[in-house]
Amino acid sequence: MTKVSVIGSISMDLVTRTNRVPNAGETVFGEDFAMVPGGKGANQAVAFARLSPNEVSMIGAVGKDAFGESILQNFKENAVLFENVGTVPQTTGIAQITLYDDDNRIIIIPGANNEVLPSYLADLWEKIKESQLVILQNEIPHETNLAIAKFCKENAIKVLYNPAPARKTDLEMIDFVDYITPNEHECKELFPNLALEEILKKYSNRLIVTLGSEGVIFHDGETLQKIPAIKAKVVDTTGAGDTFNGAFAFGLTENLSISDSIRLAVVASHLSIQKFGAQGGMPKLSEVKAKLKELEINLY
């Protein structure tokens, strides 16, 4: 069995749906509110687990509070191993999410996620060493990500790095990771002075840029490849990127090519945005296979 470790953020999403966002000093009525488990790391672990029979382990931290307890129960229900999720004397991270007009705005309060420092991993390096693939994002401290990426490079462990949300230090990671999956905005933050095609060619078969409703673009070493998105009735886009990353990682562990892994991930993302919650719409493999068959896309 392929072992995947996701090292990253674990949060509770506080989600409000409204028909418009208030201006400064204005109050508007919302249409709905919910609390659902989230955090980019946790979301990507759940997305992978929904698709794969292989072991996926979450490494991170929650607080000593009701949100933390609820999140650990959610990992259990989704077959994500969580023995390496610590409980720390901090509040569990939260994300305040406003849904409107088929899009979202998010404010993150890291809480316990900021406690996932290199020192926090002191007893976990051997566990990480057992992994065939490690998935990272940007909702834990940069120095932790960099330490993990360097460790994985030294130990021939593949790393999928999702540089979200973007930060100036992300470029330090590039030489130590195998796959980079920014969206278009994050890509511009990473490479502000280079044209997209130039960047993709430089990092062929490593840089995969998601373009929302425009699909996904990458360079295969010979030509630029663009894989279109699939039209859908949008309910909630919050977990689309995390679903993409979890599904892309699954494709890689299934020994699919990069392009076929992307196609699978695009289908998974398409299905995810048709239900509420970052994790609520994440599909099972049977759902993805049914959609692939409907679209006459043969990956297996």
Swiss-Prot record:
Which subcellular locations apply to this protein? Answer: Cytoplasm
Molecular functions per Gene Ontology: ATP binding; metal ion binding; ribokinase activity
Relate the assembly described in the record: Homodimer.
Keyword set includes Nucleotide-binding: yes
HAMAP family reported in the protein's UniProt record: Ribokinase (MF_01987)
Q: Which residues form the active site?
A: D242 (proton acceptor)
Query: Residues that bind ATP, according to the entry?
Result: N183, T210, L211, G212, S213, E214, G215, G241, D242
Please, which domain of life does this record's source organism belong to?
Bacteria
PANTHER family recorded: RIBOKINASE, SUGAR KINASE
Name of the protein? Ribokinase
Which InterPro entries does the protein's record reference?
Answer: Carboh/pur_kinase_PfkB_CS (IPR002173), PfkB_dom (IPR011611), Ribo/fructo_kinase (IPR002139), Ribokinase (IPR011877), Ribokinase-like (IPR029056)
Q: How is its activity regulated?
A: Activated by a monovalent cation that binds near, but not in, the active site. The most likely occupant of the site in vivo is potassium. Ion binding induces a conformational change that may alter substrate affinity.
The UniProt entry's GO biological process terms, in alphabetical order, are: D-ribose catabolic process
UniProt keyword annotations, A-Z = ATP-binding, Carbohydrate metabolism, Cytoplasm, Kinase, Magnesium, Metal-binding, Nucleotide-binding, Potassium, Transferase
Report the enzyme's class at the first EC level. Answer: transferase
Residues engaged in binding substrate = S11, M12, D13, G39, K40, G41, A42, N43, E139, D242
CDD domains, alphabetized: ribokinase
Q: Which family does it belong to?
A: Belongs to the carbohydrate kinase PfkB family. Ribokinase subfamily.
- Give the pathway annotation: Carbohydrate metabolism; D-ribose degradation; D-ribose 5-phosphate from beta-D-ribopyranose: step 2/2
Alphabetical list of Pfam families matching this protein? PfkB
A cellular component annotation (GO) from this entry? cytosol
Where K(+) is bound, by residue?
A: D236, T238, S272, K275, G277
Cofactor(s), by name: Mg(2+)
What does the function comment of this entry state? Catalyzes the phosphorylation of ribose at O-5 in a reaction requiring ATP and magnesium. The resulting D-ribose-5-phosphate can then be used either for sythesis of nucleotides, histidine, and tryptophan, or as a component of the pentose phosphate pathway.
Details of cofactor binding? Requires a divalent cation, most likely magnesium in vivo, as an electrophilic catalyst to aid phosphoryl group transfer. It is the chelate of the metal and the nucleotide that is the actual substrate.
Task: Kindly state which reaction or reactions the protein catalyses.
Answer: D-ribose + ATP = D-ribose 5-phosphate + ADP + H(+)
